[in-house]
């Protein structure tokens, strides 16, 4: 059985208090997931809040089992199973994060501590406590789960590491693929479009980890899928190449005789005239 209270290494750059380690309590176990919540935060919730959180995690567990896991693995490939911890369940650690963060993924966790000293030695993702009863929680889980698929498909199977912009582009597209952006108001997509419009001249492939970066890669992924189908994201993920070269290979696989720079230029023009029929 999984331990009730566990000490986890966390990313101080995302943590609300810049901590590197926290104690977390196991709140829920499903067939697929362990939900751990930062102990001090959980203990400070009143019983009604704790009840609301338990209900939210029940719903999220069902959504993961019935939709997120099957849709994303069938489109993009498998995660490491049973992986570094020998357990088919994925750990979801919920802790207090800075306000602009919904979650994160640490690829080091899938390696042993000999290879990655701060590894938690689990297949796991991190979600913000601030999102836990929000409609954006499922989008955040889908996004981070795609990073777990990516580390398996690229780093573990192909022995290459994806470029950040394309890794984020695929993860950003997942809420749309799952139908979570269908109601545009309050969606991840709406947030990203606003961020992009704040800084529409941002580079697509030079990653600075700003909201505008996420906006740019989200819109580029939307454009790619609108024109070439979700296979363009999947084929480039399963390629031994990374970044631009993997997108070009995926285009060629479909018989599209265009370079990345041509596709990029067409996207830029479509943005300029705001006509996605182009």
Residue ranges and their predicted role:
Residues 31-163, 170, 174, 180-184, ...:
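Juxtacatalytic substrate-recognition/specificity segment
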Residues 242-278:
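Beta/coil-rich, acidic/histidine-enriched accessory regions frequently appended to metallopeptidases
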Residues 145-154, 171, 213-233:
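Alpha-helical scaffold elements that line and support the substrate/ligand-binding pocket
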Residues 59, 203-211, 222, 234-237, ...:
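Active-site rim elements
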Residues 155, 190-217:
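Catalytic-site signature segments of enzymes, centered on catalytic residues
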């Amino acid at each position: 059985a999984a331990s009730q209270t566990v000490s986890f290494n966390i990313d101080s750059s995302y943590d609300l208090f810049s901590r590197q380690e926290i104690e977390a309590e196991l709140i829920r176990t499903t067939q697929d997931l362990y939900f751990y919540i930062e102990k001090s935060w959980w203990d400070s919730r009143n019983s009604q809040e704790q009840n609301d959180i338990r209900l939210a995690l029940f719903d999220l567990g069902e959504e993961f089992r019935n939709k997120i896991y099957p849709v994303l693995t069938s489109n993009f490939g498998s995660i490491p199973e049973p992986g570094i911890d020998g357990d088919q369940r994925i750990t979801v650690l919920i802790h207090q994060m800075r306000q602009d963060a919904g979650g994160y993924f640490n690829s080091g966790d899938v390696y042993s501590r000999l290879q990655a000293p701060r590894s938690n030695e689990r297949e796991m993702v991190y979600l913000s406590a601030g999102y836990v009863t929000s409609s954006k929680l499922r989008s955040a889980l889908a996004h981070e789960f795609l990073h777990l698929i990516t580390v398996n498909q690229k780093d573990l199977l192909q022995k290459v590491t994806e470029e950040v912009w394309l890794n984020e582009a695929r993860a950003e597209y997942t809420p749309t693929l799952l139908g979570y952006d269908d109601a545009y108001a309050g969606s991840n997509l709406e947030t990203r479009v606003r961020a992009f419009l704040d800084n529409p001249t941002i580079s697509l492939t030079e990653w600075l980890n700003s909201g505008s970066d996420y906006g740019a890669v989200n819109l580029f992924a939307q454009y790619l899928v609108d024109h070439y189908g979700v296979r363009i994201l999947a084929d480039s993920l399963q390629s031994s190449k990374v970044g631009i070269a993997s997108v070009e290979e995926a285009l060629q696989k479909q018989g599209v005789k265009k370079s990345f720079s041509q596709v990029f230029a067409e996207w830029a023009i479509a943005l300029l005239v705001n006509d996605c029929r182009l």
